[in-house]
Amino acid sequence: MAAIGGAVAAVFPFGSERFVKLREQFWLAMFHEAAEAGHSVIFTFAPEASVAPDFPDRARQAVEAAGGEIIFVRLTLSRDEQERRIGNPDRAVFGKLRSLELLRQLRDQFMASEAAMPPAALTIDTGTTKPTAASRLIADRFNLTRG
């Protein structure tokens, strides 16, 4: 999904009103179409100020309107590990935050955004679980199929 954010960011600055609007329109349309087609989707995002607090509710509505089901999973990472990873070059490829100073400045905002998220049916520590293993764990736990 980072490619979508990158495509939108090529036209509108990250976090701008139009960036947020277009990114969210794509996300919601993709959820709806995938649910309608019977495709399971594992989608991740970091709760932060550019994601509307009611986004999870609207995502649920988009999926359920197409006959699908949405399950929330929480991915966690320790502060130390997050700070260790923040400067990794692969983060630039996905347009992710890379400044340790900015991360520290925004941490309270991130925590407030995360606190507003719906309860998770599963929590995974990404410090000890690689991305492929996490996606397999999610798919297996909730019997997800490709459709």
Regions found by a protein language model. Name each.
Residues L22-T76:
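Glycine-rich phosphate-binding loop used to anchor ATP phosphates in small-molecule kinases
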Residues S78-R79, K130:
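Short loop/turn segments at beta->alpha junctions
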Residues M1-A35:
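Conserved substrate/cofactor phosphate-moiety recognition/catalytic segment
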Residues L137-T145:
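C-terminal alpha-helix
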Residues M1, R74-T76, D125:
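Residue-level recognition of beta-strand->loop/alpha-helix junctions
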Residues A52, R79-I86:
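Switch/connector loops and helix/strand junctions flanking conserved nucleotide-binding motifs
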Residues P13-E17, R60-Q61, P89-A92:
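Short, hinge-like loop/turn segments at secondary-structure boundaries
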Residues R84, N88-L137:
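Small-molecule kinase domains that catalyze NTP-dependent phosphoryl transfer to phosphate-bearing small molecules
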